[in-house]
Amino acid sequence: MSKMFKLNSAFRPSGDQPEAIRRLKEGLEDGLAHQTLLGVTGSGKTFTVANVIADLQRPTMVLAPNKTLAAQLYGEMKEFFPDNAVEYFVSYYDYYQPEAYVPSSDTFIEKDASVNEHIEQMRLSATKALLERRDVIVVASVSAIYGLGDPDLYLKMMLHLTNGMIIDQRAILRRLAELQYARNDQAFQRGTFRVRGEVIDIFPAESDDLALRVELFDEEVERLSLFDPLTGHVDSVIQRFTVYPKTHYVTPRERIVQAMEDIKVELAERRKVLLENNKLLEEQRLSQRTQFDLEMMNELGYCSGIENYSRYLSGRGPGEAPPTLFDYLPADGLLVVDESHVTIPQIGGMYRGDRARKETLVEYGFRLPSALDNRPMKFEEFEALAPQTIYVSATPGNYELEKSGEDVVDQVVRPTGLLDPIIEVRPVGTQVDDLLSEIRARAIINERVLVTTLTKRMAEDLTEYLEEHGERVRYLHSDIDTVERMEIIRDLRLGEFDVLVGINLLREGLDMPEVSLVAILDADKEGFLRSERSLIQTIGRAARNINGKAILYGDRITASMAKAISETERRREKQHQYNLDNGIVPQGLNKKVVDILALGQGLAKTKAKGRGKSRSPVEADPVELVLTPKALQQKIHELEGLMMQHAQNLEFEEAAQVRDQLHQLRQLFIAAS
């Protein structure tokens, strides 16, 4: 099933890209464990990484610091490698409230979660691709370091079907039930199967567009075919097929029975400890909760919160690292850590926060001590498991630079010839009035301005002041969720307003070519928000505009300011010299606003191919491409209902057209999911 990686791009590497590709490739071939790609904003770091992957032909995991950047990278990689397996692996929770106990108020908060089915399907598709083929790129968030089902158990549970194999129908149905597939002869949907005479239809959990038909003759598999579950159109006849479990956490019955015995032993030991310490309430609470879980596991094979017993279910010892997505990555895989100065500290912080919450649950008798082993990886475990790694950042952290040593690859020259912004330092005393005049000058020529302040109060006051003076301004603060944040950025690019004020939110991954000015207020206040890295990242937001400029308001030049200004000047000088030597005239970017959200259009079109000549792919309406994410979600629900209605009325062509449109809208929604 594996193919060769084939890079699809109208562009050839230029600027610093060819040298960066050569050095990274040579380093990996020489066995270097750590390399850093120091690439400025807009220098085509993703394109460089894509070229390295295509040259080396190795399965790759790309780690991003958040879902928004992961979605952006997924869209770019999907365009670069349309014929290969580009997968998306982020947290599948739309909403997640972990169980917790607050001793001060004696409040227990039950776990509450809402799972996004589309993202769950993409996660299953990602692990399947890693197990089946080598031309795989998995774009993941830091969710990848959290516990996942053991790959060995996952592989053992698979159901292999081949033409001509001898197996009776009941055996297949029993195996499907073990894989947690549910029989549903009425509503055929993902993760279900239906039976009609000697024909079994299975809708694989990792698929969103094709189902499997198993035709039996007596006790022999006579024919296997893939078909469109909506129209019934047969896509292809195949020789073999592997049915993967419906969930990563599926466990064989014998392992569950063994786990239950181990849990009983631990419960007896823990009860003894609690009674010795005169913790009668905690002992009663723990006994009651654990006994209930054991009964559920015995009857159903699972229970609510079964992940808290994951140590026993995966057969690990106390304190051992949990199985994660890294266990599915082949030994010669490649790891790319995007925006590494943010992602690496995140990986280190996940374990500590999780541990503190669970220790309270254990102490007060809500969970057994083994629940502490249901956790994300520790940083040391991540280091031990990580394959050869490329750290990608415009401002690499100390960790990456220390690990890479001399192996830091500079990518400063942009293919477009754009230079880093001009930097000016101006006094604090007149910063607000000076900023107002700069905003007005840019609003006239239809350019945008980003302003970053030190405190929430100052951001609110500045926004109010600018509004009073007739400026079109919005304020981006920490209470705004990802979806609304995407809407605000889109509105800024569309020209609904001219100025965006924020604190620490105007940094990594915001591609806004319309922004020509970045103003940093109180730049001389040394600290986290005004460190060298923060300043360089913020200045970089104006690097995609031909008139890019950054104004730092400060009465003195701090060490961080001096380093940031010096580094930016070094880059400008190198970029300018390259342009002179090669006769390049800088060109501004003309990136369509919908490009931020329209990540999966190409994917939707390729998936629509080859499913019957009666099908005509439906292009997404241009209006839909600029819908807000909330409106997109509502539109998706409406179309799902319409599609099922068409199918029930046997109007298969109309249902298929609606389904094509759904594919596109779901991909648009991923960006803000």
UniProtKB/Swiss-Prot annotation:
PROSITE patterns: HELICASE_ATP_BIND_1 (PS51192), HELICASE_CTER (PS51194), UVR (PS50151). It comes from the Bacteria. A motif (Beta-hairpin) lies at residues 92-115. ATP binds at G39, V40, T41, G42, S43, G44, K45, T46. CDD domains: DEXHc_UvrB (cd17916), SF2_C_UvrB (cd18790). The beta-hairpin motif is involved in DNA binding. This is UvrABC system protein B. It comes from Enterobacter sp. (strain 638).
